[in-house]
């Protein structure tokens, strides 16, 4: 009989948030798979947990995943931990979970901290419907395409961001959603210097361009407001793009302008107009 893979959520800053059940799970597992063994050993030492550690991260997940699967199929149990938060959520652990599911290995979640949910809860923005977008890519083209696809998104949006990329990300968010869109910037959640700044994208972009940030951020951005006027279809949007083209505007610029006023995707408008 195969063993069990336990997804053990770890603290995102405050060790007091680690649950007794999580401690018990780590103590009873045959071995622990960690994103960074140097980080996880500090957690284990704090709770006096002595268990074998193996490395499982973005750069070795294929080979390490197969090795972990083999041990699980042999009947061992494994606790998967990430440096902070819930494994397999915006994390290479999702590949290990998929591998286990495909091979009939039982997977159980040991719940705990999740920075995205904590940030959403304190943001003051609507929580009934939301979308988690994780980290934006550093590739400029892919990054803009990602944001452009969210232009008409009405749900609250959640992003993770590192301090050295925050200013550029805020500028891109402002340029995509407009300077008046509401945002909550949650910094150092559960840590000593935890802070939530509630403002607009325009103000946030200006502030952090002049004040280099410190600490990890979760960005919670308000969704688009429902338009009170008539909804513009893609076909109608394309007609608007073509009309601007006839006035001498470049196709790319025309698609962007119509997208800003209608909430339609700039890329879809551009492609559809190009094929006309």
Show where each model-derived region lies:
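Glycine-rich, flexible N-terminal cofactor/catalytic loop recognition
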Residues: 1-58
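A contiguous loop/helix-start segment that scaffolds small-molecule binding in enzyme catalytic cores
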Residues: 2, 156, 163-276
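Loop/turn-to-beta-strand initiation segments
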Residues: 3-5, 74-79, 155-156
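Short active-site oxyanion
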Residues: 26-32, 104-108, 156-157
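General beta-strand structural signal in soluble alpha/beta enzymes
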Residues: 34, 109-112, 159, 185
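Conserved helicase motor
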Residues: 55-63, 136-140
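Glycine-centered tight-turn and secondary-structure capping sites
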Residues: 92-94, 251
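Class I SAM-dependent methyltransferase SAM-binding "motif I" and its flanking Rossmann-like core
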Residues: 95-153
């Amino acid at each position: 009989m195969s063993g069990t893979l336990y997804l053990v959520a770890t603290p995102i800053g405050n060790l007091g948030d680690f649950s007794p059940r999580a401690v018990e799970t780590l103590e009873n597992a045959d071995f622990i798979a960690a994103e960074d063994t140097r980080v996880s050993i500090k957690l284990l030492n704090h709770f006096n947990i002595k268990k074998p550690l193996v490395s499982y991260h973005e750069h070795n997940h294929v080979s390490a995943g197969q090795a972990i699967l083999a041990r699980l199929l042999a009947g061992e149990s494994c606790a998967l931990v990430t440096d902070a938060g819930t494994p397999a959520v915006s994390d290479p652990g999702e590949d290990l979970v998929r591998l286990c599911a495909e091979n009939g290995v039982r997977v159980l979640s040991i719940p705990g901290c999740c920075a995205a949910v904590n940030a959403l809860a304190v943001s003051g923005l609507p929580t009934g419907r939301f979308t988690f977008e994780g980290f934006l890519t550093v590739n400029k083209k892919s990054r803009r395409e990602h944001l452009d696809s969210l232009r008409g998104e009405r749900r609250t949006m959640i992003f993770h961001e590192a301090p050295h990329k925050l200013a550029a990300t805020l500028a891109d968010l402002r340029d995509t959603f407009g300077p008046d869109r509401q945002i909550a910037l949650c910094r150092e959640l559960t840590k000593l210097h935890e802070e939530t700044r509630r403002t607009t994208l325009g103000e946030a972009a200006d502030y952090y361009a002049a004040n280099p940030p410190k600490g990890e951020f979760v960005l919670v951005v308000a969704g688009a407001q429902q338009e009170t006027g008539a909804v513009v279809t893609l076909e109608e949007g394309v007609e608007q793009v073509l009309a601007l083209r006839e006035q001498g505007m470049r196709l790319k610029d025309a698609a962007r302008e119509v997208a800003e006023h209608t909430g339609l995707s700039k890329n879809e408008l551009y492609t559809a107009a190009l094929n006309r």
